[in-house]
Regions:
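Glycine-rich, basic loop-to-helix element that forms the pyrophosphate-binding segment
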Residues: 61-77
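Short aromatic/hydrophobic "clamp" motif used to bind/position activated sugar donors
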Residues: 82
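Conserved donor NDP-sugar-binding/catalytic core segment of glycosyltransferases
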Residues: 90, 94-135
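A conserved acidic beta->alpha catalytic loop
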Residues: 37-46, 86
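Cell-envelope/extracellular polymer assembly enzymes that use nucleotide-activated donors
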Residues: 2-4, 32, 179
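Short, acidic, metal-binding catalytic loop of nucleotide-sugar glycosyltransferases
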Residues: 21-30
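Conserved nucleotide-sugar donor-binding catalytic segment
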Residues: 134-220
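Short beta-strand/loop segment that forms part of the nucleotide-sugar
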Residues: 30-39, 59-62
Length: 272
C-alpha cells in the first residue's frame, strides 16, 4: 500500500522543507511526497531539491489557487491513498502512515478493495498548535457531523478512487475540501474508517482563518449543506446547535480550557 502525500506551495519559506522533513520521518510505510509548487521565487523549492531524496517529486506550474494546485498534484500522484499536507502542518508522530495502513488493510480484508462504486476514507483527529490540544473528531460520520465538524483535511487519507469521478471544485475558495467530503460520504457511497490516534499537527492561522475567509466560509457552508442535506436534516442540525449552546462550545474548544474540553469530547465519543 502506497501513500501520496501532496503538498501545495507558493513562497512558503522554511515551512515547506519543515513539512517535507516531517513527512520523510514516517516509519514502516511506503510513500511518496508530491510537491505542487506554484512557481515560487523565495528559494523554498531549492531547499527541498537539495535533499536529493527519490521519494520526493516536484512539479512547478502556475495554478489559480490552492484547490487547483491540489487537483494538479492529484494528476501526478501514484499512490493508493492521497493525503494533503499544507506547508507548516505536520504528521502527529512518525507512525501515522503505519496506522493508516493497518486501518485500511483491516477494512480491505473485511470488505474488499476500494472501488469507484465504494471508495474509502481513513481519518482521525488533529492536534491544534494554536490551542495546544488534541481536537477529537467523531468516530462515526453522520449528517450532523457533516454539518458541524468534519475531519480536518490534513487528517484524512483518501483512496485514489475518491477522485476517480471528480476532483475538488476550485470555485469554492475556502471549502472545496468540505464540499468534496460531503459529496463523497453522502452522495458517492464512500466508506469511512476511524483511527483513534491523532493524525496531524495543524498549524492554523492561515488564510482560511482570516476575517475575509471566515465570512466566505460561512456563505460556502450554507450553500454546500443545502446541496447535500435534506430540509429536515438541516432543521435538525440547526436546532441541535441551538440546544447544545454551540457558540459556548466553540469558545471552550479554542480557549484556555480547550485541553479539558477536548478531553471530555474524547470520553463522550468513546462511549458512543
Amino acid at each position: 500500500m502506497k501513500f501520496s502525500v501532496i503538498t501545495v506551495s507558493l513562497n512558503a519559506g522554511d515551512k515547506l522543507i519543515q513539512t517535507v522533513e516531517n513527512i520523510l520521518a514516517q516509519k514502516d510505510a511506503e510513500f511518496e511526497i508530491v510537491i505542487k509548487d506554484g512557481l515560487s521565487s523565495d528559494g523554498s523549492v531549492d531547499k527541498v531539491k537539495a535533499l536529493n531524496d527519490t521519494r520526493i517529486r516536484i512539479f512547478e506550474q502556475k495554478d489559480t489557487g490552492i484547490y487547483d494546485g491540489m487537483n494538479q498534484g492529484i494528476s501526478h500522484a501514484f499512490g493508493d491513498f492521497y493525503i494533503f499536507m499544507n506547508c507548516g502542518d505536520r504528521f502527529y508522530d512518525d507512525e501515522v502512515l503505519k496506522r493508516f495502513e493497518k486501518a485500511a488493510s483491516g477494512y480491505i480484508e473485511a470488505k474488499g478493495e476500494p472501488t469507484e462504486k465504494r471508495p474509502l476514507i481513513v481519518y482521525g483527529s488533529r492536534y491544534s498548535s494554536l490551542n495546544e490540544s488534541i481536537e477529537y473528531i467523531s468516530p462515526k460520520i453522520t449528517p450532523l457531523v457533516c454539518f458541524r465538524n468534519i475531519p480536518c483535511h490534513q487528517a484524512i487519507a483518501y483512496s485514489k478512487e475518491c477522485f476517480a469521478k471528480r476532483l475538488y471544485r476550485p470555485e469554492y475558495k475556502v471549502r472545496a475540501d468540505y464540499e468534496h467530503f460531503l459529496w463523497s460520504v453522502l452522495k458517492n457511497n464512500t466508506a469511512t474508517v476511524y483511527v483513534e490516534e491523532p493524525v496531524c499537527r495543524y498549524e492554523g492561522g492561515g488564510y482560511s482563518e482570516s476575517p475575509k475567509a471566515v465570512k466566505r466560509s460561512a456563505a460556502e457552508h450554507k450553500e454546500i449543506t443545502k446541496m447535500y442535506l435534506t430540509k429536515w436534516q438541516l432543521f435538525y442540525c440547526h436546532m441541535y446547535m441551538i440546544v447544545t449552546l454551540q457558540p459556548l462550545r466553540a469558545a471552550l474548544s479554542s480557549g484556555p480550557l480547550s485541553g479539558l474540553y477536548n478531553g471530555l469530547v474524547k470520553k463522550i465519543y468513546r462511549r458512543k
